[in-house]
């Protein structure tokens, strides 16, 4: 995970325009006012065990993530936590 800048956490809120709940890591494409991000999530089993089922990050949902930007890919970030459907889930 060293490719992500953990010194500068980002808080991103937007609409989910793509959602993947597959191994090894889930992902969402998050449309924010500034740009659209590819947000790397946790493995699906971890998300499910921590109370974040697939249905809560479906396309059209509004979510907030605290994430770290990828140093080499400016459109990508790794989520530390996500708030969806009124609850916050730690992903790491």
Predicted regions and their residues:
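Short nucleic-acid-contacting surface segments enriched for D/E, G, S/T with interspersed K/R
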Residues: 49-65
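A short macromolecule-binding patch
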Residues: 35-44
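Hydrophobic core residues within well-ordered beta-strands of beta-rich domains
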Residues: 10-12, 63
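Conserved hydrophobic positions within beta-strands
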Residues: 14-16
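Short aromatic-glycine-enriched beta-strand elements
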Residues: 22-31
